[in-house]
Amino acid sequence: MFPIKYIDNNLVWNKDNEVFAYYELIPYNYSFLSPEQKYLVHDSFRQLIAQSREGKIHALQIATESSIRSIQEQSKKLVTGKLREVAIQKIDDQTEALVSMIGDNQVDYRFFLGFKLMVTEDEGNLKNIKKSVFLTFREFLNEVRHTLMNDFVSMSNDEINRYAKMEKLLENKISRRFKIRRLEAKDFAYLMEHLYGRDGIAYEDYMYPLPKRKLKKETLIKYYDLIRPTRCVVEESQRYLRLEHEDSESYVSYFTVNAIVGELDFPSSEIFYFQQQQFTFPVDTSMNVEIVGNKKALTTVRNKKKELKDLDNHAYQAGNETSSNVVEALDSVDELETDLDQSKESMYKLSYVIRVSAPDLDELKRRCDEVKDFYDDLNVKLVRPAGDMMGLHGEFLPASKRYINDYIQYVKSDFLAGLGFGATQMLGENTGIYIGYSVDTGRNVYLQPSLASQGVKGTVTNALASAFVGSLGGGKSFCNNLLVYYSVLFGGQAVILDPKSERGNWKATLPEIAEEINIVNITSDSSNQGLLDPYVIMKDVKDAESLAIDILTFLTGISSRDGEKFPVLRKAVRTVSQNQNHGLLQVIEELRKEDTAVSRNIADHIESFTDYDFAQLLFSDGSVENAISLDNQLNIIQVADLVLPDKDTTFDEYTTIELLSVAMLIVISTFALDFIHSDRSIFKIVDLDEAWAFLNVAQGETLSNKLVRAGRAMNAGVYFVTQSSGDVSKESLKNNIGLKFAFRSTDTNEIKQTLEFFGLDSEDENNQKRLRDLENGQCLMQDLYGRVGVVQIHPVFVELLHAFDTRPPIKSEVDLE
């Protein structure tokens, strides 16, 4: 029987004149939380349930659908800049590819909570009793009219206003603990259409008009409008329902809990959370909860205790052994009685129903078996009562009553709070750059890298910098390249420091943006002498002077604490900075002019580098012009013949060529400061591949902090691509990194360090195993809201896969022959 009598906003009246207020509980992220954080959520939910001393609660987990096309269309609105047309075309192609892979819609679990509104005692005065009698009489007349005419359903405006006031108080109570949204008529209609087998409609696209006629004392709605969402041919069999529409049919089966045979220990009892990850098909769940007040609960428990004692005495008098079941039950009852007496808590009658649907009977059987096995593993025994399918179906409808008393479970608020209602895995944004999907839930993951600095509500960082860490071959460079590419398409600008020259073929492999790719390949050719001199590449003389000091102290090993050599070098650099033309070769001249033993020593030391391999790039005589332009959307800087030290090599063990290579990286990275200080309205990325090479030296570490701080002020993100999270884990840098991506690692110390970098429990073996077992292309990701999950990076297009793949090509058998 259809229970709903009237709907007004989020209020639902049923045929027994009970009124429920329904809300959508905005899901909260639950993945990778520490036990302490889980207990905080548990306590909040327990208090939410326990605050209702009487009445009923109806909790629903419903597998709704969200439109992929709609999300992609919203993402298009974020695109700006020169490559807008290319980006729009790319997003359209991406949409078609995603739809062909996973369909128009993807499953999106929503959580609904309904609370029965209880009339307060002060409303029992004479005036209200008179009004109540009058309303009852009017209701009788309306019922007669409805029975005879079967057209309109009416509700007194006074009645609506009275419950609306009560609902406001309730909403205020709940919203202190959880984010909620009041339901509307279209939410109820979607819910009913979903339960009656209609699918393929995205939740956000669904419309449902519920016209009302507001009269002076009452409001009318058409009865047909109320029942319209249930239009469908329902055929009941013993253990399933067949739901038939004009263009489709589906089969539905309902399970209920028969017994809980073991302890459901928290935290590992979060059924609502785990079943989202477990099942590849949609599963709906309903909890119909009736609150039993403390006094009534104690009476029930004490009566049960008397029954058990009678059984015990009867066995004793008959000379038999009391069965172990009775002894265990007596212990449990004693414990429960003490608990209820001390805590003054209520008990709860729980009717727990699971809905499984499928397009055909064979698939329904397979899915039912899978659901049953899942609950079996949790010590929960399910049953599919024959002939009760229609009744259990009714329990899912808003404001419905409990259908059957045979399968009631008596539970406490602790049990209900431990089921993980509202818990889900959320990652990234609702729209933006599609980078892949969550491994646990299969949901698409979208990012907006420029969002951190906007101070969006809920974000835990305003840092635009990002880190990509992981061992060789895990996919960090690929993920980094993909994110930079799409950021540029969406209107950003990027400069990539490419020490291994892996991106030199991008003009050929990315023809759609080739005109906006600028590859600067700096060779050690004599015509390029002095091209990377700090005085040549830096616009600001102060910045150039600062970089010149950094480079020369780095190469010569002179410390700023060296009271003999450092002042001499500093004076020479300052003098050159004040000249009309400046270059590092002039520093050597100034030192020779000084003509002291110390200055000659320093001059000789610096001069020994000037003609060593590609070091000539650093030394100019002041006549060289800056030939490096970073005005394109995507700029790649490559220095030929760089030899980077091994990750484990200490600074003291660097060879001369390695020392020079790192010096080059420091110069180019500092040059990126000028790029960062360009147009503040455009989001910019400075991408530092093999960042560990200069993060391990003092000058590089100082520079990275400088870049990150300048970036935050100037709408620019610095992306660190490195093999170890330890490189970016120093407090000064770690706190300024927003998005984090960690790829597979097998070293236990490195894994612990990475988990610590993410703010996770580094000693938790499950966390360690997750990171160790990641496949190629999968990463642990932390978004701007501090949420962590495992993402499968998904390029969608095969041409992007080839363009960004940095693995060496495998020779075919033909080549080998």
Predicted regions, residues:
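Charge-patterned, long linear interaction tracts outside catalytic cores
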Residues: 125, 439-445, 450-452, 457-470, ...
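Short glycine-/polar-rich loops that comprise or flank the Walker A/P-loop
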Residues: 53-56, 109, 490-492, 517, ...
